[in-house]
Regions:
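Conserved "ABC signature" C-loop
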Residues: 122-169
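Conserved ABC transporter NBD signature motif
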Residues: 92-101, 110
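Primarily ABC-family ATPase nucleotide-binding module
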Residues: 17-64, 221
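Helix-to-loop junction immediately C-terminal to a conserved catalytic motif
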Residues: 84-85
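Catalytic Walker B motif of ABC-type/P-loop ATPase nucleotide-binding domains
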Residues: 198-202
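The feature captures the beta-strand-to-loop junction immediately N-terminal to the Walker
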Residues: 69-71
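Cytosolic ends of transmembrane helices, especially the final helix of ABC transmembrane type-1 domains
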Residues: 1-17
Length: 247
């Protein structure tokens, strides 16, 4: 391995080791969230002077889709991560899930049962198609439900094949998975998990317009039972939201 590669790897390990230990909290969160309240939230990453948020206050209520907007570098992705319980030791102000302060909630239970998060660059697991799609599920969904989502997002060629067998390894049918296909898989994971709070970071950046419409229709269909926060630069996605919060 080249010296430069070793140096980069060591620096990355040191960065990870420098991360503060995440507070766990002891309150078991409800899997039915009616409101998220942010009060005077301020945040900047450690070892930087740049303030991403300053005294931000806003509420998110079940039954609504919220678009988080703002220019590049304004902290949109960071804001979703804060609600996801990340970087809480560097946060000032309060974030409450229902009436419980986020800092006092058990973060593992929160992410396992209450919050779902799709990242800008979703990860694919070296495992079966079924396990990739049900990665976030507490209870195993029926094959029929999984297959319906696969067909809805036009992933039959990648994931089903003629045998409709979900227990083959994901990379056996295709050696290369596109960014759009990864985003579709991440969206299906979210839908199968069905968390009370859905956090979607640029979920449509690599999707074709038909798939964008499919996602928006799904979100509108399920929003009555959820709080949905999403980030997107697509005007069509922002317009589909019930409310916008500009950072």
């Amino acid at each position: 391995m080249a010296y430069q590669s070793i140096t980069v790897s060591i620096n990355r390990i040191e960065q990870i080791l420098d991360l503060p230990q995440e507070p766990v909290g002891n309150i078991i969160p409800s899997d039915n969230v009616n409101q998220i309240t942010c009060t005077n939230v301020s945040f900047s990453y450690p070892h930087t002077n740049k303030v991403l948020m300053n005294n931000l206050s806003c509420d998110f209520v079940k039954g609504n889709i919220y678009a988080i907007t703002g220019g590049n570098g304004t902290g949109k992705s960071t804001f979703l991560k804060l609600i996801n319980g990340e970087w809480s030791s560097h946060l000032s102000g309060d974030i409450a899930i229902n009436e419980d302060l986020l800092a006092q909630i058990n973060q593992y239970e929160l992410r396992k049962n209450t919050l779902g998060f799709t990242e800008q660059e979703p990860s694919i697991v070296d495992d079966t198609e079924r396990n990739n799609l049900t990665l976030l599920c507490k209870n195993q969904p029926k094959d029929e439900e999984i297959i319906n989502y696969i067909k809805l997002f036009n992933l039959e060629k990648l994931l089903l094949g003629d045998d409709q067998n979900l227990d083959v390894r994901l990379n056996e049918r295709s050696s290369a998975i596109s960014g759009g296909e990864k985003q579709k898989i991440a969206i299906i994971r979210m839908m199968l998990m069905n968390p009370s709070v859905m956090l979607l970071d640029e979920p449509t950046s690599a999707l074709d317009q038909k798939s964008v419409e499919v996602l928006l229709n799904l979100l509108k269909k399920v929003k009555k039972d959820h709080i949905i926060l999403l980030i997107s630069h697509d005007p069509k996605v922002v317009e589909a939201a019930d409310h916008t919060v500009e950072l």
